[in-house]
């Protein structure tokens, strides 16, 4: 099945941005909803005030008292990059503020599942926990919080996931997505919420003379912004103005060589130059290697990497993560072949694919089903949930959606209409996780397909490449590419600029197995440009009969043997 991919241009928008900005940047920012210069602020003074976060006063009080009483604090994280950075940041910050009894615990994806479950509480109790602080989880952990209380353990929940109808009975709860939280940004990642709590705690301790009385140097929390940037980008949260400040500051520290040894080691194994780092490198190079620990092994390896102060140890741990990531890629490649075979079987049985795909194979790896769902969604442009066996007749699924279908809302509707179909579920608009009994998979697959069929129509399943318009030939330069690189950070909901244009196709050849290397020239005349399109359909390309193409592309800086040149990163190409 070939999904039709259309080229559409972002609408132009009014702006109050000053003429001192280059016209191209004014246009690009306006197309992304930026109206005033203050929305482009990158300094820390532009951050939203931590006092606007609901529940932060209570959380600070619980933490301050725990530090004063020298209670044992256990940070309970999550097994993804956001959870790992949140955990490491909170441990480092609390220790720097005088916490002598600060430990951490990351649930094992395969043995414990997600969140603060009673099983995880038992592990925290075994560590002697007197206070549990959740990071990047906890907003739906009713049973875990209740179990902690039965054991005499207090709980502070910090999370950013969407809450359910009822909330756990924690001593304090911070989540910008709570209905009564007035914090203007709802886009903080888990590591962003943790950073805000640590800022508030430091301010409180400063005011009460904590550091002076104990002869402690007041910690510079800006030193942790490399972790904030990595976790925020890797979790693919919207890059609103507040998140762009956090990421810009973190990137600046990394570029200046002021990052933690663990991040430096991740840069080395992924062959990234710290001085030239951009936000997408965090998402596509560092994030996957950190995530590999939680997908295939235990995220404690990732947290230890972020915590360690010794570059030699960091390099060893980063090498382990790099090997895990390579294994993940191999597992994913095999699963993708099987998934495409399942899609072909579905097409043969009913002419067209369902608008919503639920897929299961008994040999799939539950740590990789989320990536698989993402790949299949990209290929067929429809909501996809992939399931893997989790033992004891239970399946765990991970879903990815497209614009127009809020995946968590869809699962909530299924749960309302068919109670008991799912054992549990949670997530966001574009991604969700769930579990169900294996015997009910076929029923779930049909009901999910029916629901998506009601909520979407076929026109919404067409792939769309959004363009910011054409670049004139004089703009197709290294200078423009470098300006765009520095104009970010770009990312989710603040996309890196994509342009379109018609070109004469002068050269085309495959590099690797599926990458198309080209040389093109604008039809109206202009510079000769190198370009590359990754993972092309090799049944279609290269095609020596094609002389002219329409391209959707990003203008990129290519570095080779110390020489910098402009290059087109081709998102899609259409023969003319």
Swiss-Prot record:
Its EC number is 3.1.-.-. Gene3D superfamilies: 3.10.310.30, 3.90.1640.30. It comes from the Bacteria. Keywords: Exonuclease, Hydrolase, Nuclease. It holds the Pfam family DHH. GO terms for biological process: DNA recombination; DNA repair. GO terms for molecular function: 5'-3' exonuclease activity; nucleic acid binding. It is an enzyme of class 3 (hydrolase). Belongs to the RecJ family. Single-stranded-DNA-specific exonuclease. Required for many types of recombinational events, although the stringency of the requirement for RecJ appears to vary with the type of recombinational event monitored and the other recombination gene products which are available. This is Single-stranded-DNA-specific exonuclease RecJ.
